Amino acid sequence: MKFFSIASLGLLLVVATAFPASELQREDGENSVTRNKPTRASSGKTRRQISYLIKEVFEMRKELCKNDETCIKSHVAVSENNLNLPKMTEKDGCFQTGYNRDDCLVRITSGLLEFQVYLRYIRNKFQEGNNRDRAEHVQSSSKALIEILKQEVKDPNKIVFPSPTANINLLAKLESQNDWQKVMTMQLILSNFEDFLQFTLRAVRKA
């Protein structure tokens, strides 16, 4: 019994010296750093997802405009809505000057989360057929993109989540519009979402 205890103690000492604590800690530290560093495969997947969304949003705009070129190319402004749609600014770190990958990813992810209530509104307006399917698919694809980007954000606590109460109030405000205003609002949302995705694609290519 004494021989077994001594042998066991010797084995534990060998294991402890073979794997120093500093080595294990260094490996954990390296893993935490590389976990947020995008691989070539993950970056390619992100770009493909964004490009796909841009294409689908453009198709939705065409359907909404009934393929009228003037309508498609115009960026309508419905001033009475006072919509606070997400936009990119220089301070977000996504532009050529002052590019900051971490700040940019936080802004992109937060912006996509802000757009969700507007995409839900559009989905509800498209009642049936291909329009409804495409609207649902655009929203689900944008949610998938958010999850991809969350994995690359260095500090997820910096991501800003919209207030559920504010979203409920916004939906009520949008629903109170007349039919013409609703169509113009949908066009405004889609054109701004497309612009946001274009900025996102350019920023992700730099990462």
UniProtKB/Swiss-Prot annotation:
Residues 1-18 form the signal peptide. Transmembrane segments: none annotated. The keyword Membrane does not apply. It is found in: Secreted. Its main location: secreted. SMART domains: IL6. Residues 31-44 have a biased composition (Polar residues). Keywords: Acute phase, Cytokine, Disulfide bond, Growth factor, Phosphoprotein, Secreted, Signal. SUPFAM superfamilies: 4-helical cytokines (SSF47266). GO terms for cellular component: extracellular space; interleukin-6 receptor complex. GO terms for biological process: acute-phase response; glucose homeostasis; hepatocyte proliferation; interleukin-6-mediated signaling pathway; liver regeneration; positive regulation of multicellular organismal process; positive regulation of receptor signaling pathway via JAK-STAT; positive regulation of receptor signaling pathway via STAT. The keyword tRNA-binding does not apply. Disulfide bonds join 65-71, 94-104. One of its GO terms (molecular function) is growth factor activity. Gene3D superfamilies: 1.20.1250.10. The modification Phosphoserine is found at residue 74. Residues 26-47 are annotated as: Disordered. It holds the Pfam family IL6. Cytokine with a wide variety of biological functions in immunity, tissue regeneration, and metabolism. Binds to IL6R, then the complex associates to the signaling subunit IL6ST/gp130 to trigger the intracellular IL6-signaling pathway. The interaction with the membrane-bound IL6R and IL6ST stimulates 'classic signaling', whereas the binding of IL6 and soluble IL6R to IL6ST stimulates 'trans-signaling'. Alternatively, 'cluster signaling' occurs when membrane-bound IL6:IL6R complexes on transmitter cells activate IL6ST receptors on neighboring receiver cells. IL6 is a potent inducer of the acute phase response. Rapid production of IL6 contributes to host defense during infection and tissue injury, but excessive IL6 synthesis is involved in disease pathology. In the innate immune response, is synthesized by myeloid cells, such as macrophages and dendritic cells, upon recognition of pathogens through toll-like receptors (TLRs) at the site of infection or tissue injury. In the adaptive immune response, is required for the differentiation of B cells into immunoglobulin-secreting cells. Belongs to the IL-6 superfamily. Component of a hexamer of two molecules each of IL6, IL6R and IL6ST; first binds to IL6R to associate with the signaling subunit IL6ST. Interacts with IL6R (via the N-terminal ectodomain); this interaction may be affected by IL6R-binding with SORL1, hence decreasing IL6 cis signaling. Interacts with SORL1 (via the N-terminal ectodomain); this interaction leads to IL6 internalization and lysosomal degradation. May form a trimeric complex with the soluble SORL1 ectodomain and soluble IL6R receptor; this interaction might stabilize circulating IL6, hence promoting IL6 trans signaling. This is Interleukin-6. The lineage of its organism: Eukaryota, Metazoa, Chordata, Craniata, Vertebrata. The gene is IL6.
